[in-house]
Swiss-Prot record:
Species assigned in the record: Branchiostoma californiense (California lancelet)
UniProt enzyme class: hydrolase
Site (Cleavage): R110, R111
Gene: PC6
Family: Belongs to the peptidase S8 family.
Entry keywords, A to Z: Cell membrane, Cleavage on pair of basic residues, Glycoprotein, Hydrolase, Membrane, Protease, Repeat, Secreted, Serine protease, Signal, Transmembrane, Transmembrane helix, Zymogen
Keyword Methyltransferase attributed: no
Protein name from the UniProt record: Proprotein convertase subtilisin/kexin type 5
Stored SMART domains: EGF (SM00181), FU (SM00261)
InterPro entries linked to this entry: EGF-like_dom, Furin_repeat, Galactose-bd-like_sf, Growth_fac_rcpt_cys_sf, Kexin/furin, P_dom, Peptidase_S8/S53_dom, Peptidase_S8/S53_dom_sf
Catalytic, as annotated region: 111-488
A biological process term (GO) from this entry: peptide hormone processing
Glycosylated residue positions: N246, N529, N885
Domain Peptidase S8, residue spans: 167-487
Amino acid sequence: MPPAIVILALFTAALCAVNLRTVAADGPRIYRNEWALHVEGGTAAADRLASKHGFINKGQIGSLEDHYLFVHRRTWKRSLRSSSHRHALLQREPEVRWLQQQVVKRRVKRRVKRVYSMYPWEQRVQHSSPQVNNPAQQDNLWDPHFNDEKWDKMWYLHCDRPEFACQWSDMNVEAAWKKGYTGKGVVVSILDDGSETDHPDLAGNYDPDASSDINGGTLDPTPRYEYTNENRHGTRCAGEVAAMGNNSFCSVGVAYKASIGGVRMLDGDVTDSVEAASLGLNPQHIMIYSASWGPDDDGKTVDGPANLAQKTFQAGAENGRDKLGSIFVWASGNGGRTHDSCGCDGYTNSIYTISVSSASEQGKVPWYLEPCASTLATTYSSGAPHERKVITTDLRKGCTESHTGTSASAPMAAGILALALEANPMLTWRDMQYIVVMAANPSPLDRDTESAYPRDPRKESDFVTNGAGLRVSHNFGFGLMDAGKMVELAESWRRVPEQHVCEEDPNAQQRAITKGETIVDTKTTGGCNGTDHHVKYLEHVVVEISLDHPCRGHLSIHITSPSGTRSTLLPERQFDSSSDGLKDWAFMTTHCWGEQPEGDWILEVKDLGQQNCQRYGLRTVLPVLRKWKLILYGTAEHPLYKRDEESRPHTPQTREEPTDEEECEDGDYYDRSKQRCRHCHDSCATCHGRHSGQCLSCHEGNYFVEDEGTCSEECGQGYYKDEEERKCLDCSADCLTCQVSADHCTSCDDEDGLKLFENTCVAQCSEGRYMDENDVCQDCDDSCDTCTGPDATDCVTCADEDLLQESQCVESCSSGYFQQEYECLKCHATCASCSGSRDDQCLTCSGHLELDEDTHRCITSCEDGEYGTEEGKCEDCNIICKKCNGSQADQCLECHHDTNLYDTTCVQYCGNRRYPENGECHPCHPSCLGCIGGEINQCNQCITDYEGEDHFLYQGTCHVTCPPGLYGDTTDQVCKACAPGCIACDGPADNQCTLCEEERAPTDGRCQSEGSQTDEAECAEGCHSCEEGPDICDSCDEDYYLTEDTCVRRTNCPSFTYPDDQDRECRPCHDNCEACDGPNNQNCNSCKEGFYKTPDGCSTGCPNRYYKDDTNKECKPCDSSCFTCSGPASFHCLSCADGDFLHESSCRSTCPAGFIGNAESHECVESSCEQDQYYSSETGRCEDCPYNCRACDNDGDCAECAPTYIVVDGRCRPEETCEDGEYQDRDRDTAELSCRPCHQSCKTCSGPSDTDCDSCKGDDTILDRGECITSCGPGEYMDRREKKCKACHPTCKECSDEYDDTCTACNDGFLLTDASSCEAGCPPGQFLHHGDCDSCHRECKTCDGPHHDNCLSCQPGSYLNDQQCSTHCPEGTFEETYEDDSGETVLQCRLCHVNCKTCHGEGEEDCMECANDIKYKQDGRCVTECQEGHYPDLTNECQQCWSDCETCDGPRNDQCVTCPYNYYLVLGKCLEDCPEGYYDTMRQEKECGECHPSCATCNEGGNYNCLSCPYGSKLGEGVCYPMCEEHEYYVEKTQICEECDNSCKTCRGSTAHDCLSCEAPYGYHAMKHLCTACCEEGSPENEYCCICHESTRLCITDREAEGVQFSSADSIPTNVAYIAVATFICVVIVVLFFVVFGMLQARSNGRLCWAHKYQQVPTTRYEKMNDHVNILSQEDFYNEDSLSEDEIHSIDSTRH
């Protein structure tokens, strides 16, 4: 066949293959003949099951323990139908916990496909081999001028256009390089389509342990080469991370000395197991995984990691890098053109990945960018087609200037992370995310951003400030990654507190989604407060949503945090016409980072319905929000309070502010708003603000309360003392108080039903029991799993499969109930049967209501202002509602014009962080505390952020720092004008300037003409310190309070402020207050104009049950019978509380005579009955009132009687008149009234007994609680002026009749002093406990409680140790003796140094044994690792290395780990030159590269750089061609190939000492050419073995048994019989050889009838195509561009 036809046929086949693959990806599922299984019992159990059922076990999947991949050879490798019959039996095996047939997943590389023609600067550049630099130039000092060819064009790493001032041109990478960080020691792996291992710019950094070929099942990640260069993506990404610097070739990687690996996993079928194997490759070695791929960016796909990949992400975070956590970097996506959102990508949406976005060179939004809330940060990449792109390595050892998209951003971010990880290798995966957030720079991107692509409608910056004061964007995350800032933070970073996960119960009430309308649903959370999952400071927020919709692309979904930060979870996607909805899809947002979660989270789901949907009408899908759930990730402790001031990262918005923090002394902090150092609060040793709650550490003797940031001498209730750290730590949630540890309770909370048992708080009854009325635990009913009582059948959960309905366990739900999980819940009142509890989930209706098929509601014909009752009637809404869905005040849907809707109730005042608009309360911008609108420039009051920093109001916007010429007034948080001439100041006075015009420094706070001076003066009255001038106080004397840098008396605090006694400052009142005694609205004493005083503060309107008093400007309470009123009296009611009726502006439980109560209007309406009749609802007619009753209510109870009769219990009784000293009494049997005498001590009384006095006889008696007495009871004294008995002081048991604190006897635990007062105290040997003096433990001399063994001093001969007395000191302490002030000898135990287990002193060098976590001992000190040049021996003593080694792991010369300068490390030895089989890599680090196994000597790696060949091979243009097959060697004399020794894989001779390579599992000894066993743990000392390299299986060093000799003679048998047999076999073989050789010669000469002449095989390269041999020229044969390494191997194998 002609060659042209062959090429055409192959080309057509290739196109068909591509088309078939595309159809398969877009069409139905493709199933592989592979199954992933979770098998208990390990590899042995998996192998047994595979063999039993006809599968092959391919081994463990990545790093997932007990997860295996099975293959079935009798199943189609790729099929459109699943093969469930293959694993039906397998699934029944008890060891199989889970299995799944693997499905091909469509995964695309996130490079940008060209939309314009190729530009010149996009052309790929081919290069010759790199030049070798002079070693003298390979200096450790960083040189800003690299000699790499494209360095000058790498605009994103350095400024290459000085004429433009390079304002936004780089990511501050050079700052990290200047510190000496290059990524050295950090391992990065690129998960992609492979990576060229021998690329000139990558080979020196290539790490085989970070590489694998998952697609091909080998260890070599080299890409598959084909004519389109489709598999160039991974090589390009690798170059961005770790292209070598200063090698005169191509580009420079961000981390140009990092180790780089590649994983080939995209060039084939991608399944869940393929992804898991890639993500879990060697997680203890690889530190950073970079991925620039994901689901289709087509604007319609919703997809993410499946079961195995999700487990691998979590396992990597929990166990990778020795439990520090693997770091996963992901490209956010390139679906901008299709309006895609990375919120629909489960990889970028994961909390375990760092999702990276792109920015153009101009800092603009690229046309391909996908905005979403999960993006963490941004790096530079390509923009519009005419803009410059990223330079990096390319396929076939090339270089490109056209790498694009977020594919370029993710590896660039991975390189920056490698620099930070080199600065601090102990960073956890969460530490790294914090550092990215804190260091990200929004400034280059936070501008009026015009998109770099004309079709993209986004025109403005979308940065907002969240509730923690951080700037964040859906386009760019927290901003541009800043490498210099990241390594600076990493250097001193301390680990963030442990991660807590608060998972709220789902909102499962189904809501119909209506076209053009928005569903708003609120979830209130306390952040799991009071539990072990408490989240106080947020990191990630995940919202899991399930919904149905016929056209998913019509929906937009948002979530708003309690701080007002609004995240777009899902924007409208016009190409998404799917009717699949969302099934528990997890959206994630990072925008609430640092906020506190407590409060209302608002979910908005809107059906925009603007585009036609292709799927409408194809199948019926009702648009319904089924459920949503909130999952909060974060910390219970403040993540920044955990580190010292100098190590604490600062929030990004202050990055560009001038700072002199390093110049502040201990006890001071840097005030950013005033740009100077200020004193901490007196209680703080170090701090980050001036208040008592802003401490970072405490003075000696005090304890630090982390949650509050305060210092205290004692820990309060709910805390215990950590004496070592000097901190107050939280007790367990069950403990009321505790000691020593969080769960060592000393008391319990009785209100929670807990009791103390062996220092643990336990519930009173165990599970399955309840406490009856007699406080006895009883068994629950058999139907209950748990119950509450008072009866055994009051179930909480049910046994077996029963369902809980109204506290009873039933087999199935009754009519009018529906099943939700294991509970029967009541349907809405309008539903007879239902699918949920809402009124729009009815299936059938109750009463006379009718079902609306569209809304699934049961409706009536009620008007606005009415609602339908259960009986199908229309009744009035509550008076405060205009529209409602019930009669209650919290069931409003719309309000009257003078009130606003706040959630579901109507209020006159919306409160903080909200503003009224269109009758509703809307959230302010997150930076506002109060506002007039939702925009950033509509604030009227500013927040104080979570670091305690005030924000200041200027022209409607809240600023961290006021503009020049203004200062931040902390009293009202407003920017106010400085004095004339000041451009910066601390206050309005002319002596408060900090910077003058023309940037002159002020003199004593005043701006004066140059040369003038002011004499120094002492501080003004009341000032304790005044460093900047006598009138600028930094702190005040006692009894003075600081206000605007001035000290005043407490009573002289300015208007609108109040004295804060704790901080001794005049603090601002709430904005609504005119005068106050505290900072909150509730602390107002009087209100500003337009506000009324309420119990909750000052408000523009009054709440229900209150009315406006315009005279006193306050809200006064209505009469208790009124719900709303116009005045204080009972006859001023406007509406009544539940159950009462309004009559003539009064509220009554029953209507008066002649009126009946209207149940709908709750008013009394006139009755048609006569005056002495009432309307009976039972008979439906007018009935007569009782005898002698003139008028009665509708129940027939008398309200008015005839003359001489009175009303008694609703009936008329004869009236009886009583004299003074008598009271009226009613006979219990006859109900007749009579007069009875009062007690003799009473002057008057009112009953019902004779001692119920109203007044007393005589002056020596007083009225006390209705009784006339002459003396008071125990613990009381008589106040004769007020004629009352009053309680004595709490310490007094008895007191005199004059004063409450003039004690005559004391309560237990108190002693009576000479001054007649009672003071706490107990004699020596006792302590005060619950008011009594209890004895100390017999070993204590003195003690202080709360337990008898909390000793303060010990009896003679005992040692005091941590408040305990003992005869000897425990481990970790040493004995010390001293004399106290009284001269007595004191014995105590002192703590050893933290590194010591036992010691004889407190010094580091006084250790006798080392602590458990410290292994080594050097020069008498316990150390975590031996010093350089030393290694630990078997006793863990540090010993000196061999003299040639810099570091080592043993004493011999072949146990070096690193070498001195100018030495090479080869097989554990430090050598001056590279030995045979190795070559000089010419790197700065002086490394020997290993020659290809086919070479004897070489000048570079690879099989085409040989200089000489081993025995049995021939050299041809740098390639060594073996002349024999594997297991054979070439004999020069006979020119034939002979068999190797059985131990060899390849060899140069017949003995065991002639091996060149070995079969597994043997190791190869390169010096002795020997294959031998690798030493294992427990190998006998007399056994010969070698210590092998883990991956190459090369012998690093050997161990010879004593007396064992190895020579060629070892393999020669000495037995004569053996020699005879061997000789006979040799003769037979020789005869057979000549017979066969003769026949072949005859055939080749055509002398046999079946013979054909051989065609001579040329020594040139050939290719076989369809049985036709094409001969190529010698020149083509050695052309590098036309001959790949794989092809050379093909030639070799064919030749052999």
